[in-house]
Amino acid sequence: MISPKSLMKIATTASVAAITVYVAVVPAYAMQDIAIEDTPSSFAATVDDAQNSSNSMPDNPNATLPETVSENISDDSTVVSENLAVTPEGDVQNIETGETVTDAQLVGTQSQQPDPLAKTDGESFIPVSASDVKDAVEQSVKQSVEQSSSKNGATVKLAKFDGNDYGAHWGTYNNTKAFFDYRNNLFAQQAKGVIDVSSWQGDIDWAKAKADGVEGAIIRLGFGWGNDADAKAQRNINECKRLGIPFGIYWYSYAEDASGSRQEGNDVVSKLRQFGVSPNDLRYPVYYDLESWTWTGHTPPTNPNVYNGIVNAWYGALQSGGYQNLGVYSYTSYLQGPLNNANIYAKTRWVAQYGPQMEFTAFGTNDRGWQYTSSGQINGISGSVDMSAFGVKELSQNVPIYRMYNRNSGLHHYTANYDEALDLSLKGWLAEGISFFAAREGNPVYRVYNPHDGNHHYTKDSEEKNYLVSLGWRDEGIGWFVPDKGKANVYRLYNPYSGDHVFTEDLEEYNSAGSVGWHKEGIAWQSN
């Protein structure tokens, strides 16, 4: 509703972060809108150069195989890092020696969950069966023997792939940046490059990271329940807010049942509030990280129905706390095993797959994320960082038009450009959400600018546009397109005191503003 006070300010319940888009990570040189055939070969190799290397872990192309696997490691154990395996009973063993690991930093205690990234020194690792690792080690030994005569006994590692025929890669689709698998099958369009980070990355220089092409971040808030938050979560959140980097949150689960996940959910809500993160601050979801965890005296669930209850309880806690934008994160083999449940699939929006293609195809939403490498390199970050591509499978025909409000001048601004809206919000403008939806093609709506008072105006009438230009307004081209026959009327209001125009679908707002002095100028156009 438009407030009578000053006849200018439009009431808003949205914050800056109400401008919502689905976005996602790549090396800086790959974060360019480039054609598929022009994708740098080195980037294709970054994604997949080690996938077929003779000394790489299955499903983890950047993790090195052990030289040998102890006979004490059973085939049904799970390898959780380059040097650790977990038995079905939950005991952690050294892969090469078979000795049981008791370091509380790695396995926790009966009452204390360990940092899940401690086992891998902060890097992501997709758990794989010990049987597969044994097969890979055996194959690696055979390849080394076959190649040793021509390589003077040196350790052999296959060269990087030449071009992008073999690796997942960035390109363009429908004139938007997109991410493809190694066969050029589209994973997502309108795609963004996103990193996920934790305290293991230390103090990140977020300004450098943003300048290097980072378009979003998923920040670890914590793990389990009753633990401290991630030591760098507050700093990472503050920096993303300061620099206008869209961000989301992830929380690693140690839940054995719905009771545990409910506690985890309550912990997430508590820490989000503690760190000043409102639902409107989150451009990406709060992700529930479900993996095969290791915790002394405890074992992760294996029944999908149990996990379904875990997910529902966590969702309930977050939703009760006011956080609705949620998602599940996991890796393909776990989704095809303990998480194989239709309800969980419907909530899965981010998947780790360190290979040439995404093998999980049951995304329940149009938006999706592919964490495609754990060894990305970004300026401002020491060491490796996970990279993901976030986007949508199908391109929406609806173009959101963002409404911004300047509290100092009392003027409103409308734009189809999300980056422009974000830039204005960083300069102090209030984001009043999406005013209406335009179309991708149709009748042009022209945008003109008054350099004397900073006012913008938007009109479908080319004669009105030309007349204003003749008076000194600047022609800024086409702002967006609208259909001949749309779903709803968009009304035009004029403030005779400020010269401001407001465009709204809300008939109640239109009539209310008219009752307090705004000029009701009828239907401007229809929304898509």
Write out the residue ranges for each language-model feature.
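Bacterial Sec-dependent N-terminal signal peptides
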Residues: M1-T13, Y29
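Sec-dependent signal peptide cleavage junction
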Residues: V21-D38, A44
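Structural recognition of the beta-strand scaffold that forms the well-ordered cores
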Residues: G193-D196, E215-R220, W225, P246-W251, ...
